[in-house]
UniProtKB/Swiss-Prot annotation:
This is Quinol oxidase subunit 2. GO terms for cellular component: plasma membrane. The gene is qoxA. It comes from Bacillus cereus (strain ATCC 10987 / NRS 248). Catalyzes quinol oxidation with the concomitant reduction of oxygen to water. Subunit II transfers the electrons from a quinol to the binuclear center of the catalytic subunit I. The chain crosses the membrane at residues 49-69, 91-111. The lineage of its organism: Bacteria, Bacillati, Bacillota, Bacilli, Bacillales. Pfam families: COX2_TM.
Length: 291
């Protein structure tokens, strides 16, 4: 009886604890606020995984509670001795098959979502993606638009409703590019190009950040992603092409040196004199910065 009372007292504290926990959440978590097809697919996977694991936890705790109460030691069965058993084929089959089924139920949607994120979202297969090279440096982000022949630092403009093919690389320590409301993160590494497809469904401002610690300036590696209508995006590109200064090699080498900088805009990009696919990409910047 005392055990039952203690259990129900603890159970009654659960709703109050949950309310206290939720009281600290003054706004939506970015990861749980998908604003594009890639983020939506990953959000659905998170929800499915959470529900399945919650069901498993609930079943385990219910069985644990039932066994704890029903088969606890009582005064009337102090001398009870359970029969000797050498195995139960049915139970052994069940506790072998159930984990296999759980793993399959988690694996199939995970694999499908992972492979789907490595290409243009199926809803936008008919739309040509905008290609943007993303370069992480200590401690800033460079965004190069090869077709538009422009480059930005620490901010990014994209057209809404259009898939974006990001090509990720680095001129410093390994980093991770992440815009939580548009999709999952991916690493940036020297001498490598990693593809990442994202898309914003509607115009808006989304916060991007580094998801990999890279030293003292790590906290400054945030950037704004502004999704614009196609008309406003084209207008912005034209303005940059006509009014922004050129990005010279000297200026580029100054930017990639370790340090914190503000937003910058240029009417040319560093891809015209640096090949990010080359294994000498990192060494090029290292020796240039030593001069």
């Amino acid at each position: 009886m005392q055990l039952k009372k203690a259990f129900w007292k603890l159970a009654s504290l659960l709703p109050x604890s949950l309310l206290l926990f939720l009281g600290g959440c003054d706004k939506k978590l970015a990861v749980l606020n998908p604003q594009g097809p890639v983020a939506k697919a990953q959000y659905d996977l998170i929800v499915w995984s959470f529900l399945l694991m919650s069901l498993i936890i609930a079943i385990v705790f219910i069985l644990f509670t039932v066994i704890l109460i029903r088969y606890r030691e009582k005064p009337e069965n102090m001398d009870y001795e359970p029969p000797e058993q050498h195995g139960n084929t049915l139970l052994e089959i069940i506790w072998t098959l159930v984990p296999v089924i759980i793993v399959i139920a988690l694996s199939i949607p995970t694999v499908k979502a992972t492979y789907a994120s490595e290409e243009v979202p199926k809803e936008s297969k008919h739309i040509k993606p905008v290609e943007i090279y993303v370069t992480s440096a200590n401690w800033k982000w460079l965004f190069s638009y090869p077709e538009e022949k422009i480059e930005t630092v620490n901010y990014l403009n994209i057209p809404a409703g259009v898939p974006i093919q990001f090509k990720l690389t680095s001129v410093g320590p390994m980093n991770a590019f992440w815009v939580p409301e548009l999709g999952g993160m991916k690493y940036t590494m020297d001498g490598m190009i990693m593809d990442l497809y994202l898309q914003a469904d509607k115009p808006g401002s989304y916060l991007g950040r580094s998801a990999n610690f890279s030293g003292e300036g790590f906290t400054h590696m945030e950037f704004e992603v502004e999704a614009k209508t196609k008309e406003k995006y084209d207008k912005w590109v034209k303005e940059v092409q006509q009014t922004a200064p050129k990005l010279t090699e000297d200026k580029y080498n100054e930017i990639v040196k370790p340090g914190v900088v503000g937003r910058m805009t240029f009417s040319s990009h560093h891809l015209s004199y640096v090949d990010p696919k080359s294994l000498e990409y990192c060494d090029y910047n290292y020796y240039k910065n030593k001069k």
